[in-house]
């Protein structure tokens, strides 16, 4: 498979993972929502405790501190776009948001998330690759950027 095509397909997969709650944020860092990966990285152990008849999962950190699973911040599609370079909005004659084109990488290759065309687009030295963004994911991206536009 072409390296550029694989790259844009991986971007679509990463965005879908963010949108589905497959990542969480702890200590300002991003982790897959997989307790084994988190504990391997942080050196913690997983325990469960019965609290007033409910079973709660928590992580015991190396310093002895406890983090309850419910206290972890689930990453959203907005977190995926927390560090973009530029954005072009498509605005209707009624001045309402319609779509956007977000520059997420540049300088080799340039990569855009385009919700009008529903594609991740990569361009680099005459090479071009694109991957389709599923409708439900595109709607989540548009929902986030419509909120940003209206702020």
Residue ranges and their predicted role:
Residues 1-151:
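Acidic interaction surfaces
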């Amino acid at each position: 498979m072409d390296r550029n095509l694989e790259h844009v397909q991986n971007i679509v997969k990463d965005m879908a993972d963010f949108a589905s709650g497959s990542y969480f944020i702890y200590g300002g860092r991003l982790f897959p929502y997989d307790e084994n990966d988190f504990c391997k990285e942080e050196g913690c152990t997983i325990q469960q405790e019965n609290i007033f008849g409910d079973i709660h999962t928590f992580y015991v950190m190396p310093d002895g501190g406890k983090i309850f699973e419910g206290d972890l911040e689930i990453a959203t599609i907005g977190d995926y776009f927390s560090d973009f370079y530029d954005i072009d909005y498509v605005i209707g004659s009624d001045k309402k948001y319609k779509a956007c084109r977000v520059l997420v990488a540049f300088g080799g290759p340039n990569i855009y998330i385009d919700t009008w065309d529903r594609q991740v687009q990569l361009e680099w030295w005459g090479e071009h690759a694109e991957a389709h963004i599923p409708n439900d994911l595109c709607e989540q991206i548009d929902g986030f950027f419509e909120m940003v536009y209206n702020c």
